[in-house]
Each structure stands twice: as structure tokens, then as C-alpha cells.
């Protein structure tokens, strides 16, 4: 219908049509997983066929392997994205799949890779990219890739990738080409059919596509047909490509815009114009053009006529086996009326060549399907007639179940006789059309001349068949069925007397013999063909081998293979086809005699971990869910087999059952415990002797017997009986899952088993494991100590009984389930239980065994993740070779567990131990561990990529990273790429954790303490000290100094390597990623990112500059400043200051700091009391030439304390958060300055006259007064207390004291020194002293006459330190001295606009001056500023390091004289005492 309205569709309609059609096609593919899997297998078969046809000595280059691997990885990642429900994982796998598939999509289509056309790989990639964009809900890209697929490779897209889509989009446009081809083929076929002059073009048209006509062609006719089909296929391809480009232009063109030309509709022109209108009777497979079989690889044309003919014969045979139904979508267009004599017949004995199981036919040579025709087999062995041909197209799945109608019983005799005539008259080829055979123009006499030739071939075939009388298998999916008992006699003919026998053995009476297992007598559920050619039910042959037999049950040939082959899917499909045609008969032979524990039971495959001594086999991997085996829901009678080849005779079974009956009766009804115990032992013996016959198992699986065994477990105290009961139950569960369901239905049964396990019965662990309990059950019974005991202790062996699973293996599996279940708290608690039960050494030792190794690794991993402190315990005992062997041999899940385990294990608290462990990992194993990890990294799921990347990077950095390394590049790229996944916060967090652990600061408890270590470097060492205190308490070994030194050197070397690799990767790309992480709304992520960024910037400036510093500055500087502004955490702000510190020395940073200077200045002032780095940054900031300090300065008066009632404030002193004041009337007051607004908390009146001076040393306060005393005070949080009074007989005007002596100034010249015990000594230098300052054993005295005297307190001598230039007019006096950071600050009368000088005590020279026109009487200094108080109530403020004036503060009282000045220790507050008895408090923020 599309062909009728296609010319009336405008561009919008075409886009709508494309959207609907392609979207529907892609949606159907995404929904049908089985179809995708089947399609991938078929494409892989074509690749394999091409590989097999090439030169086997030719090596495939690594680059070619990489391209093919990328395609495979991309398809696998896409499948994972389709199957997962985790949106984070889905998007990540889609990104990875796109990256992999784009490699193949962009290949040059004109070239080849490993013999495979690039166009094929590119089209395959485009198909999967179309799936990918559909999953992303991007319809535009989805359609674009689907159309690109047809442009790149129209031929294989039409036959392999999207035949349904080609039919909908392109076939309606190809009618003229199909018409031309039909006419040309008609013309050729008219030359082949004798006396065909009376046939018109439309009469019997379908006969011209009959496959058998090709076989009658002459060589020159066959060559013409080949050229015709080649030209036909090329025409379809070219026009498909033309229309695909047109559709693509329509999708990309904007119909609403008139600027871009509207795409022109192309016209599909055939090589010649057809003369007749297209017939509706042309089958769809003709319209599809030539179709290349999968087994032909990519050879588009046969090499010779022989090859062509052989391909025809093989394809016809393949079609006979498949018995496909009509194309589900093309039936209406391809209906061919069936002849009354031509109906489908049933399949009996057939021969299938494994190479042809997936052949697809071309319209000229490989289209028609014939039931009942064989190749390479005696023709007279056939009992089926030749039916009318079915129609086949690429849309017919080779796995589609046939839906043929049942044959008419009245036609059997007629068909059989005809078949016999055809069979005996085949001469040139083994396939001739039924329609031609019935034609009157072809005489039987003309054909019968070849009877002798056929007879010779039949005899040869029969002799070959006699060597393998039943079946022969070449590979896991190929099967040849032979039945010599129904072939003709030795003279090569089959007599007509055999016809009744054929009818008697037809499908209507019983199943074909080859569909029935010779052991069980039942139709196959899971057939496997042994190396001897015999086929058995998988479960039956498993039990045959388990009983100790090593030969084939029928041929008695020894079996060399230890593992059963995979399911014979060819035979299984035939059986399924037969069952659908004969449902009643199939039900009779599948169910009636199938016991509950029959071969169809999948219970064996449900047990993932078995160590059963010749019992364990790989359960079949069913690729088609439609053929999944169904378990019976009720007990059935024992199967009765009458086959002469049956191994287990029914008489023997009945004998065992009769022997069991009295013991079963005792077990179920007796009240005598010893009698029941004896019955259990006898039942076990008989069960063992039955060689696990399924019928015996079914008999013992009755609920009453199960309950009797459980009662024995509850009542008996005999260990042998208990263990034997468990043996019986275990065997029954192994065979039939319903036994486990019976036990699980009663909670007390599990409680009984748990009690037995706790009482030391190791075998109870086996039964618990087989019952598959949930985590809640295991957790409720607290089985971990008992499970560890089972693993630790040597188990007693059961006499003559072999358990299906070793109890130790079962215990480990249960332990794994227990540790992996529950929440984080439960996992931690359970891991602690394993560690406290001393289970770690036992589990580590258990790794030597292959069985259960995966579970052991999983358990140890759970222990390390829950209790990181056990890593050292494991690392000191483990042998890593078993873990690496498990990694190399395991699947993706096992590899992921191994990688996580190794990644956790190397996170030790000692770098030297880590390196030793890494060397072991690197050197162990038969394969290159690093290369294996690299390959796994490229295909690992997201949840394991970070672990393997971290591990691979550490292995690579064991050597100095001087040269380029693909391992290092891939690992670092993976870690950094994870940091960019802002949509997946969990992945970002894991990446940050992995990078922090790479730094190497790991505590003995297994946690990273990089943050505490960085804070300690910044001067905030409380977190580090607290951590070390805990670590030392848990540390019992006394490390030698040499060992600690080696550890320190190893860690420093390691950190330099890590920092160099991370910083220099792709020109500092990690800093750009960290910039994004710092913007996260997650506080935890931002904190981890800040720690990592701080460490990297600190390490960056210890490495040679390669241009990365500029990248780090641009990426991080502004982000960390934002953190400084927004964070409320002290630790975060200190980390920011540490990260900023390296940038201060960079001139390019100064401009940025100028912008943020004012905002960060206040924060840094608050932080400097906690962090020395903050103080250093603040100092550097204030000294930057680009920063205007006057813009940073600000102050505010907080409060004014009015103490005027006590007179003038003569002295102030700050100590331990308190401000002490000395007043005119002798009162001393204490103010609490720990809060922003100080308040008076104490007032004392110890002195009777004015308190002239206050000073402190240590925790002592010293006060001097005009009352001729010096008092000593202790300072407490609530005030001061006088403890000593020294009466010195004279008034004291100035005091400097410590615990050894006191220096004071009285009325006369010089200074007096008092050592607290002897009489004061006068040091007279004939000058009046105005101020004092003490530094060590030196006393500096500010004297009249503009000079400073230096007194040596050890020798009591003095000398001149400084002498200034005196003026004739006015007095020049040094009013105040103060020492700060090895500098002496002197306040003097203003001379030449200079009123203060700064001296270096070490150099004894002037290093600066304070320029002001006012006399400075008092001075106060903090870490940043100098405050100078004048007598007119003004305080001048200077920058301490540069001695530049910043600002001035005017006292509120106007020109009040400033009598005292003091700043707090943090430099945040300024206290000013004045002559009017007030104390003003200023906040310097």
C-alpha cells in the first residue's frame, strides 16, 4: 500500500512515516532480547566463516583486533545498558558503548579489516548506535544511524541487519526492478522447460522460481542466471542507497525554511523497462534479491559451478530440516495454491550438515524449501514425500517454530509410492521438484537408468553408518540422524512390502526413535551428543557417569572428555517442531513416564558451587527461552523402558523399591527411635546402591518420608545417623527442588538444622546451603562462629557415602551470603564476628583450594570493607597467586570481585608494605598482570573500573615514571573521567576516595588521614594529634627509628610520583575536573575534593614547572576562595588557606588576590590564631604592592568602660583573655575580654596609691604602685589573686619583671634591679629613665636626652644602645619602649616629623621609623599593625612590616590624653586607656 501513495507524500509526511517506521522497528528490537542475541550469533557466524575461509597462516594485526574488539565491547556495553535498571549505570554504559561503536562506524567502507569488509562492520555499528540513541530518546539520531546503515552497506543491511525495515522503507519503490528481474528469469527458465511454448507469463508463474529447475540448467544457462542475479542485486543495492540518502536529506531538511532546497524524490530504474505489470504472485524472497548464506562469509559470488551446485544441495537440505512456516508478514502477497497431491509430510530420519544450519537462500539458486530431501545420504532411506515448496525470506528466523498443517491420512499411500519412484530415479542431482516429477513430459524411464549408481552410493553410505548406528555429531550444534534399519536391502532397492511398516512407525503412532533417550525412554528435554555419536538426556548421562561408569552406555567405547558437551540444539529444534505437530503424543511421552526428579529438572544447575567428585558438570546455557525445560508439579510413576539399549532395568528398580518399603514404613510409623535410626542407615545404603536412579529418588521424595527424616534429625543423638539423614536429604534435594520446598515450608526444620550446626555437625551446613535461606534466617540464628568452626576443623568422612558438596564449601557460601546481606551496620557486625572467631587465617589458607575460592575472596573482601583494620592481618598471611589465578580464569563478576579485593588489600598503613604487596601482584602469575588488568579495565563495568584503575596505576608507579606508559595513561584517564561524571555523584565520590587513598596517608584502622595531615602542616594540629593518640593506643609494636625513617622516605618518594603523574596528565586535566567537583552541592564530595586539591597544589610547587601551575591557578583559585567565603567549617577554611599559600609567590595571582583581598582579609585575620599558614598569607597579602592596605583597614568602637570614679587609667595589660587596669586611686580592675563586649568581672584595692605599671611573665602578674610596693598575682579565669607583696621603700614609676628579678624606676637617675630576695641594686648611668623593656638578660631603658641604654643583667653593666640628635629647643624624651619579634619599638617626641623608631636587636641598628608630627606617648603592637597613641587623643596606625601609615583613630573624648594602650594576642581588639578614667574598646575587623 505504501507504493500507491508514496508520490503524494510531502516532506512532513515522509518524516512522519520514517519516524513511525524506524522507531517501531528499533523499539521491537530493543524489546526482543532473544532476537538481538540470535542476530549477533548469526553475524558472528558470518565473521567466523570468513575467518575460516581465509589464509590460516596470516596473522591479524593488533590494530585490526582492536577494532573488532571495540565493536564487541560496544555491543556488550549496549546490552548491559538495556538490561540494567540503574539509571546511573545505564547512562555510563551508553557513553562507553557510543565511544566503542563510533570506532567502527567511522571506518572507510572501501577497505577491509582482518578480511571483513569495513562496510559490514560500519553498518553493524550504525544499527547498534540506532539502538543507543533510541535509549537516549533522541529519535533524530536514531533514524539517522538507521539510514546510514543502508547507505554504508545496503546489501548486508537488507539480508542481515534490518530486512523488515528494508521491506517497509525501500521495497515499495523497487517494483519496476522486481518486474524486470521476473521477466528476465522467466525468459531463461523458458529455455530450460521442454515444450513450454504454450505457457504464458502469468500461467504457473511460481514454477519459474522452482529451485529444481536450476539443477537442470546447462552451464551457459547457469552462467546467465548468475549474471542476472548479480545485476539484480546490484540494482537493489544502488537504489536502496539512493533512497536512503533521500530519506536522510528529508530528515535533515527544514520544511519550514525556503532557503534550503527540498530533496528530490529519486526514481528506481531497472536496467531495462519491464513489458508486463508486476504479478502479485511473485514471492517476497524474490523481491529481496540474492541472499548470501552465513556460512559463505562475505564472498558475494560463488567461485565455480561446482560450488554453486553444492551450495544449492546444502541449502535445500537445510531447508528440509528447518521446516519453516511462511513469512509472517509476507503471506498475503506470496500465497501459492497447494496441489492436492503435495502436502507436508512428517520428518523421520534426516541428515544435517553442521555447516548449513543457518544457510539463507537466494531467489535464483537458494530459495525453495523441500521437506523430505536429503544430501550426502542414501536416498532410499527416506520415507517422506517432496512437498510443495515453502517460501523463505530473511525475515524467517531459523529458530521460528514451524506451524505446518498435519498431513491428510488418506494421502499416505499415495505419497509414499510417489516418493519411492522419485527416490529410485535420481540420477544427476539428489533434489528434483515434485512438480517436475509429476509432469507427463518427463518419463520415468529416462530417469531410472541411474539406479545402479544410486545403489552403489547407498551401499557405501550404509557401511559408513554401520560404524555409528544411531547418531554422529561434528560439533555442538550439528547432528546427523541415521536409521539403517529402515533403509533398503543389500541389493540397493527398497521393496514395496516395507510401506506398511513405514506407516506403522509414522509420527502418528509413536515418537521417532532418535527423539527418545535410550536410558530414560522419554523424549529428550536436554539432549547431548557424546564423542561416540550417541545422544542421551543430559541428566541421565550425568547420573550414569556419577556412578563410576567411564564408557558409552550403548557402544561401550571409553569416554575421554571430562565435561559433557553443550545442548544439541539442532535435535532440540526438531523435537520441538514435532511436539507442536503432535501435542497429544508429545504429552504422553513427555509427562506420563517422567518422574519428579527426571532429567528435565534443572535443579542441578541451580547449585552454583559443587565439589562432587565427577558429579559436577556445566549446566547447559539455553539460548532460547521458548525451549526452556518445564518441571513436573506432581509425582509420577517410575518410567518403564522397553528399549533394548536401556541401562537401568525396570526389574532392578522394582527390587530396590521393594527393599526400601519396610524401612520406609519403620521410618514413617515406628515409635522406636533405634529402629528408625537403623532404617535410615539401610535407606542410605540402598539409595547409594541404586546409583542415583531418578525413579528411586522420586519414590523417596514423598513428603511423609521427608518429614520422617527431619524427625530423626530432631530426635536422634547418634552422629552417624544424623549425618546419614543429611546425606539422604541432600541427595534428594540435589535431584528434586520440591524436597527443598517441603523443608522450607516449615520454619522449625531450618531451626533444627541451625541447632545441629551450632552443636558441631558440619554436614548441617550442606543442607542449610541447599535450602537457600534468606539473610533474615541466617542472621536470626547467629551462625557465623559455627560456620567458621566448620571451615577450621577437619570434617569426619562418611563411610562409603559421598556428599554432593563439601561442608566446608557450603559453609563458605553461607558465610558469603551472611556477610553480603543486610545494611552497613549488619555487615560490619558480621565481619567483626568473623574476625573475632579467628576466621581470617583459616579463610586465607583455604584459598589454596580451587573449590570455593571465589566465595573466600568475596568473604575476605566483605571483612576488609566492613573492618578495614583486618587488612594487615590478611596481607601478612595471604598468597596472592590463587587470587590472580581466579582473576585470569573467572568471568566478569569474579574478576570484579578479585580486583576489588586486591585494590582494598593494598591500602595498608605502611608504604613499604604496600610496595612489597604490589611487587608480588605484578610478578605473580603466568600472564602479565598489568596487561591483563589493562584489558579488563577497557571492558569492565563502571562499578569496577575505578578499583582496577587505581590498582593498575600503583603497579605502574613501582618504577620511576620517566617514560610514557599505556597502563598509566589509561588508569589516570579512567580516574579523571570519573570525576567528570557530575550526573553520577556516587562515581565521583568513589573516584575521590580512590585518589585520596593513592596519596598514602592511611591509618592502621584503614582510613585516610590526609586531611588531618594537611591541617597539621597548616598549624592546626588538634585533629592529627587526636588521631595519632588513638592510633598509638591501638599499636602494640615498637617500631625502630630506622624503620620509621625508611617508611618516611618511601612515602615521600611515592607521593612525588603520584603527584607528578596526576598533575601532568593531559596538561593538568585533573584540576579542571576538581573545579567541577568543588561546585557540587554535596558537602562530603566538596570536602574530599578540597582535600585532594589542597594536597595537589602543595605538591605541585615541589615539582618542576611544566606549565601546569597556570592551569591549576585558573581552575582552582577562584573556586577555593568561594569555599573560603561560604564554608562554616574551620577545617575547610584552613585547608583553603593551605591551598592558597603556594599561589602567593606567583605574580600572576596578585591581581586576582587584589580583587578578593578585602573579603578574604577579614577571614584570614580570624583564622590566623588557628593556623600559622593563615597568618603567613595575611602578612603576604598586606605586603603586596597591588593591594591597597588602606582599603583593607576598618575598625569600630565596641564599648566604652567608664572607670572615672577611680581616677585616671594609668596602665593596661592584656593576659589570657583578660584586660587588667591600674587606676589612680590604687584600684585594680579585671575585664573579661573573651567576648566581643568586655565587662568588669573583678575589682581589687590591694594597693593604697596609684597603680603605675603592670607586666606579666608566665602565669604571674606583677603590679607596681606609688605606695612603694610591688605585688605578685596569680591569674584565674574569674580574676586575680595577690600572693606576694614586696616593700621596696620607694615609689615605683615603671616596672619590668619576671620570675627571677624585677627592674624598676624610682625618683632618681638610673634603674634598680631587685632579685626578689636581696636588696635592690642601682645601675646608675646619670640619666633619668622614662620606660623599660626586657629581652632575655638584656634590659633596655628609654632615657631623657633622646637615648636608649642597654643593661646587661648578668653583669649589671650598661652601655649606650642609641643616642639621638638633640635639639636646642624643647625636650626630646623616649616615652615608651616595647619589644616584639626581635624588634625594639621606641616612642619619642617628634623630631623632624619623626616620632618613633624601630630597631633590630640582632643588628643593633635602626630599620624603620614612624613619621608623624605628634609626640607618641604609648605604643601597642600586634602581628600586623603598630598603634601609636598621642597626647591629643589620636591613635596612629602603621603597617608593621612596611612601616607605612594606614589610618588614624580619634578618641571619642576629643583631645583626651592617651595614658595606656594594649592589643589582644590575636590582634582583633584594641584597648585604650585615657586620662579621663575611661577605657575604649575597638574592634579591628
From Swiss-Prot:
Tree of life domain: Eukaryota
Catalysed conversion reaction: S-ubiquitinyl-[E2 ubiquitin-conjugating enzyme]-L-cysteine + [acceptor protein]-L-lysine = [E2 ubiquitin-conjugating enzyme]-L-cysteine + N(6)-ubiquitinyl-[acceptor protein]-L-lysine
Composition bias, Polar residues: 466-484
Functional pathway: Protein modification; protein ubiquitination
UniProt keyword annotations, A-Z: Nodulation, Repeat, Transferase, WD repeat
Top class in the EC scheme: transferase
Biased composition (Low complexity): 438-450
Region (Disordered): 337-363, 384-450, 462-507
Phenotype upon changing residue 1267 to N: In Ljsym7; impaired nodulation and rhizobial infection
GO biological process: nodulation; protein ubiquitination
Known EC number: 2.3.2.27
Gene Ontology molecular function, alphabetical: ubiquitin-protein transferase activity
WD repeat boundaries on the chain: 1194-1232, 1246-1283, 1409-1448, 1454-1485
Residue ranges of domain U-box in the record: 510-585
Biased composition (Acidic residues): 337-353
Annotated function: Putative E3 ubiquitin-protein ligase involved in the rhizobial infection process. Plays an important role in the early steps of infection thread formation and in growth and differentiation of nodules.
Identification of the protein by name: Putative E3 ubiquitin-protein ligase LIN-2
Organism: Lotus japonicus (Lotus corniculatus var. japonicus)
